[in-house]
Amino acid sequence: MLEEKPVPKEWLASFERLMQVIDTLRSPGGCPWDQKQTVESLAPHLVEECHEMVDAVARGDMAETCEELGDLMMGILMVARVASEGRGFHPGDVATGITEKLIRRHPHVYGDVEVDGDESTVLKNWEAIKKEEKAAKGLDESALSGVPPSLPALLRAYRVGQKASNAGFDWPDLEGPEAKVDEE
C-alpha cells in the first residue's frame, strides 16, 4: 500500500473558510436567497455549473476552469449543508462516503489486488465492485442500469451505447444489429 501524503494545511483552511461562508449565508441574518434554497432547488444549478466547468476545460481556460470548479464545489457543499438541516446527512458524511468508495474501488492501491499497470483491468475491477455494491443495496443490475434519465439526450444515448457494447451488443456494421432485431 502506498504511503498517503498529508493534505496541505492551506487547502484544509480554504475548505473550512468556504464552509464558514456557506453556514453564514444560511444562518439568520444571512442571505435571503441562500436561506430559501432546498436540495431540490439547488440541483439544477449544479447541472448548469458542471456544464460551465466542462466548457471551460474544453476551451483550455484553466483560470475559468478554476472559477467554475469553485462554483461547482460551493454548490455541492451548499446542497450537503442544506441536507444537514434534517435531511439525514451532512458535508462530512459526503466526504466520508466518497473516501470509503474510492478506497473500496481501488483494491490495487489499498489492497492486494494486482493489475500490473493495466488500465483495462482496473476498469473491469471497478465495474465488478460497483456491481457488487449495487447488488448489496438491492439496486437494479440490468445491463443498462446506472444511466441517469436526467442526462442530456446525446450524452444519454452515448452512455446507453457504451453499456450495450459492454453487454455484447456491438457490431462492426449494420447487418449485425439488423439480424439481432430480426432474431428478437
Predicted feature residues:
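Flexible "arm" and connector segments at domain edges
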Residues: 1-68, 74-184
